[in-house]
Amino acid sequence: MAVQQNKPSRSKRGMRRSHDALTTSSVSVDKVSGETHLRHHITADGYYRGRKVIAK
């Protein structure tokens, strides 16, 4: 079983955790329907970049 030789400092702990921050997902608003959607994804109505791409 692995056992640490020395206790990691607060600085090293912080350096390790520096990449753990959560980021918010970028959301766009469609030109035609005004609906919010994820970037590079179609809206729930089937619009992408102002054009109807899926007919429901």
UniProtKB/Swiss-Prot annotation:
Q: Which SUPFAM superfamilies match?
A: Zn-binding ribosomal proteins
Query: Which keywords appear in this protein's UniProt record, sorted alphabetically?
Result: Ribonucleoprotein, Ribosomal protein
Kindly list the cysteine pairs connected by disulfide bridges.
none
**GO terms, molecular function:** structural constituent of ribosome
Residue ranges for the region (Disordered) are 1-29
**GO CC terms on record?**
large ribosomal subunit
Tree of life domain: Bacteria
Q: Which InterPro entries match?
A: Ribosomal_bL32, Ribosomal_bL32_bact, Ribosomal_zn-bd
Residue stretches in coiled coil:
none
**Name of the protein this chain belongs to:** Large ribosomal subunit protein bL32
One family from Pfam that matches here is Ribosomal_L32p
| UniProt source species | Pectobacterium atrosepticum (strain SCRI 1043 / ATCC BAA-672)
